[in-house]
Amino acid sequence: MKAILLILCLTAVSLHADESKHRIVGLFQPDRQDDLREIVKSLPDVQLVNLDYETTEATFSYDVTKLISGYNPKKPPTEEAVTKRLDDLLRTASQGTFTLKPLATIPKDQMQAIEIKVGLLDCKGCRYGAYLVMAKLDGVERATVNEAGLLTAWIDPAKTDRLALEGALKKARVELLVP
């Protein structure tokens, strides 16, 4: 009996799941949290442990031996390889509407919030398109958009500013409304 208990304990220790935390591109409005949860449920051997909409950070749990095909315990994959695999799975399952980014580079209290009012964004796809213009810019740590057409970006002021955001939106032909 003691031998069986010992084997079970050792097995439980060796079957631990790995976790990693990432920023999520695609969380531009609150209902996208539900979309992400549903998509992650479809990923084999990947669980969403925690999701913080305010920071757009998500913690994923997975068994790296199942996540990485051809896993070799003598040469475990790099953190970058695991992140790339998770990103590929998420991007494919969401048809490209969710992707991973590294965690924010500056603390929240050092970010500057910039609000930009834009023209009609009456559908989720339109809001996503306008959001993506900002979310992909260097220095944008987080962005949101609402049905009223208010885009909000939390930026690293050392890397970007309002003019750069407005310029990118204009280039993408998003109508800016003057306050």
Residue ranges and their predicted role:
Residues 1-3, 170:
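Residue-level signal for functionally critical sites in structured catalytic/ligand-binding pockets
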Residues 3-13:
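Sec-dependent N-terminal signal peptides
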Residues 18-179:
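Flexible metal-binding regulatory segments at protein termini and peripheral loops
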